[in-house]
Amino acid sequence: MMGASTGQGYEIARKSREIVRELISEDISSLGPAEVAIVERIVHSTADPEYARITEFSQGFVDEALRSLRSSGGILTDIEMVRAGISHPSRCYIREPAVRELAEKRDITRAAASMEYAASQGFRGIVVIGNAPTALMKVIELTLEGLMDARAVIGVPVGFVGAAESKEALRGTEIPHMITRGPKGGTPVAVAAANALIALSKDKEV
């Protein structure tokens, strides 16, 4: 549970999770068990109960994400910090020289360029966006055009410029997804959601 590896650590995590459940029980009453587990982990990781009210899942998101993980689908992130926090082999191309060149040539962000690069490399799997709205918009574009095989998208970029809009754009598609409405989100949320799915895919405690 939450990375606990000792008896004391497990007990702390258990008590914390009990507190989280009391705080958000009304807000998650309509969610399925897997969705509840994901939201609980997000709230636990951020110490912010508001995520229970602003986190949304599209129909079939959890099933598609778990199916991808169990069939050796990849995980792609927008920045290295998100990749570093995920407890599963993941890819982030933002530092690739080819991505830098593409971004400069096209006058787009490196985060967006990294999604184009991933698509050109035949990426298939779950896309995890915790910081860059431009990356999320590019994933939507590539997926709808049939150029990227995004099986499921965790779309939780943070910020006041483009974050809410990019999530609403994702919300309006049929791409399996989860989002946090409004400007809130970020690395801790993205990592918590991804690691919860990974645990669920292995039938482990979230």
From Swiss-Prot:
EC numbers, comma separated: 5.4.99.60
Highest taxon above the source species: Archaea
Name assigned to this protein: Cobalt-precorrin-8 methylmutase
Oligomeric and partner information: Homodimer.
Coiled-coil ranges (or none): none
Native source species: Methanothermobacter thermautotrophicus (strain ATCC 29096 / DSM 1053 / JCM 10044 / NBRC 100330 / Delta H) (Methanobacterium thermoautotrophicum)
Biological process terms in GO annotation: cobalamin biosynthetic process
One Pfam family per UniProt: CbiC
Enzyme class: isomerase
Keywords: Cobalamin biosynthesis, Isomerase
Keyword match Isomerase: yes
Function: Catalyzes the conversion of cobalt-precorrin-8 to cobyrinate.
Catalytic activities: Co-precorrin-8X = cob(II)yrinate
Family: Belongs to the CobH/CbiC family.
Binding site for substrate: S16, R41
InterPro entries: Cbl_synth_CobH/CbiC, CobH/CbiC_sf
Positions of the catalytic residues: H44 (proton donor/acceptor)
A single MF term (Gene Ontology): precorrin-8X methylmutase activity
Keyword Isomerase assigned: yes
Biochemical pathway: Cofactor biosynthesis; adenosylcobalamin biosynthesis; cob(II)yrinate a,c-diamide from sirohydrochlorin (anaerobic route): step 9/10
